[in-house]
Amino acid sequence: MNLTKALTSFVAAQKLNEELLVVVGGGAAGVYGAIRAKTLAPNLNVVVIEKGRPLSKVKISGGGRCNVTNGHCTDAKSLAEHYPRGHKEFRGPFFNVHGPMDTMSWFSNHGVELKVEDDGRVFPVSNCSSSVVDCLMSEAKRTGVSLQTGKVVASASISTGGKFALKIQKLINCFEHVEANYLLIASGSSRQGFSLAAQLGHSLIDPVPSLFTFKIEDPQLAELSGVSSNLLLLL
């Protein structure tokens, strides 16, 4: 018995004879990339596939204030060297042409007033991540980006016609098959992105954590959960 079902939502989003860009991941990079693509190519059909709620991590970043970028280190090469393995991992022309100042200018031009704090972190003047989230969501809607949630790109391959053949899962045993002209994988640290890249023939470097939590059994520290503070830690 074939349990695969053809869904009509994606077909409706892709108009006849229009080129299609599928963005895997509805985080900051995915939504921002989708907006940029739609801005540069208004006739391009842009669809973002996200399993959960778009920009959910943006909403909680920076303690709920959303740390946008760094305002003290504006040179792209220098900035990369301050990230763990950044001098090796940040590659490609995009990082060289779109740095912190470009990011700050974009948000300022779209109504989000920013401030640079003493340590270089850039936050919205509102001190509320919703300013950034609302801006991105509003611009995505204005430009015509389609955000499709509750879906996962289960597999990717190259079709005989040279397009990206994608298998998109909405529910268990409920799939839709789509061919896209372009594919942007912006799934962050999710294993999904690494899996899709490998399926398309890319070689991968095993990921290692740069930001992680400590699991401490001491119940006295439970009340400190979620509290952030500047400190010097020696390991």
Model-derived features: where do they sit?
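Conserved N-terminal/central alpha/beta ligand/cofactor-binding core
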Residues: 51, 56-143, 151
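Cofactor-binding loop segments of dinucleotide-utilizing enzymes, especially the Rossmann-like FAD-
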Residues: 26, 51, 209
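Hydrophobic anchor at the start of a short beta-strand
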Residues: 44-46, 114, 183, 204
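A short, basic/flexible loop-to-alpha-helix module at the beginning of a structural domain
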Residues: 3-18, 174
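Glycine-rich FAD pyrophosphate-binding loop
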Residues: 22, 38-63
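Short glycine/serine/threonine-rich phosphate/pyrophosphate-binding segments
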Residues: 30-33, 187
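Predominantly flavin-linked oxidoreductase catalytic cores and closely associated redox partners
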Residues: 130-131, 135-235
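Beta1/beta-strand and adjacent pyrophosphate-binding region of the FAD-binding site
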Residues: 14-29, 47
